Amino acid sequence: MNDYKLDLEKYATLARQAAAEGCVLLENEKQALPLREGESVAVFGRMAFHYYKSGLGSGGLVNTRYVVGILDALKECKEIQLDEKLLGIYANWIKENPYDEGQGWGRVPWSQKEMEVTEEMLDCARSNDVSLVIIGRTAGEDQDNNTNLGSYCLTETEEDLICRVCEVSKCTVVVLNVGNIIDMSWVEKYHPQAVLYAWQGGQEGGNGVADVLTGKVCACGKLTDRIAADIKDYPSTENFGDPFKNYYKEDIYVGYRYFETFAKDKVLYPFGYGLSYTTFETRAEILKNTGDEITVSVTVSNTGEVRGKEVVQVYVKVPQGKLGNPARKLIGFAKTKELAPGEQEEVCIVIQKYDMASYDDSGVTGHKSCYVLEEGTYEIFAGSDVRSAKSAGIYEEELRVIEQLQEAYAPIEKFRRMKAVLRADGTYQAVTEEVPVRTADPHKRREERMPKTLEYTGDKGYKLADVLDKKVSMDEFVAQISEADLIAMFRGEGMCSPKVTAGTAAAFGG
């Protein structure tokens, strides 16, 4: 086998771009960001010194050659001046309060102890042009978030830090180095000028964040979750956390599908939302409509003063019919190229009608276990988020089956699930209906469909290439392999192979 060396510089460049373009700008009052050349910046928060590159669990046990944190990257930015006095205060405190690594799998703290803010630190906030507050969170496999302080919610020390810095600073920017959304009620309380979700950007994450903060990259990330005012506003909260069963009462009304249908007023930031350093104008129309797909044309114009990219999002409003549906469903999206001020681009998004179909698990449409398009008017919307997307056109459909399937794992216990009913005024009422319970035995069906057992033949000298050349069948090739070897190929060396990172499942041959 020829030696192959990865072009790490190329991959690092791509990772840096992904980290930057994934950052989501939620607030940017009076264009606080990007940071301007020559501005002095006071960096607050111990997580400036300890960047979360990833979450926990198997996905977090990744060996990287290096990790660039946010502070590491900011120190390389010659355009701004960092307050070295404040950094020294934090560095001395961290010596006495080292990073808590936790106690191994499933026992790593969601957040780190934060330094109590002092008057000396607040003087730094007063004397600099910008105060940058960095908050960090981690979570992951075997260690989901909870509603405790320091997980979904800020700790008292973190909230006090944001509160007091916002009170005295000319401009406060909060950067969230997190793997998922957290409670955001503090934004309305303390009104920081800018809020940036930086997520966990991998080994080049710090560079990506710094590129956005300094304007080398125009903010263009969008929320993949909507952010509600309170954790209790999410309908899944009621039944979360049962280790034995899950009553999926919200049914298809998950995330933005619930809030856009029933609770728009409880949303702080809608699905798909994200600000830019420039502005865009979009015009959309249905370009083509065939039996199985539609093509939506969206013209995006950069109406601002800096170069930037926009994410075009396409949604559909389908008939309520007999099944009930959310007010809008995401069916397509695309990102533009980087557009100069005054430049425009036409983006064409092809959408399969399969993605607009509804699943009938009860047979109420006359087509049980089918994806169907119900009869009625379908309206397409396009824009920069679910809330602001505007109509691109409407068309009619007759009732038709898109795909015939079979019942698999329907619920085994009766309960009531959520359903939307359209009122005369165009709003939606949340009602409930009995969930269809299981009528087929999936275990029995699998047993009936099991292939015949191959009789072990021993080594016949057949190679896999012989199968490719159609000299023998795959069954004849596999029949040569012993049961023990087949098991080893299927499960590898388990979770404890010395040849790979501990915890890696199904390692095979290192």
Question: Residues of each region from the PLM?
Answer:
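C-terminal non-catalytic regions of proteins with extracellular/luminal or membrane-system context
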Residues: M1-G510
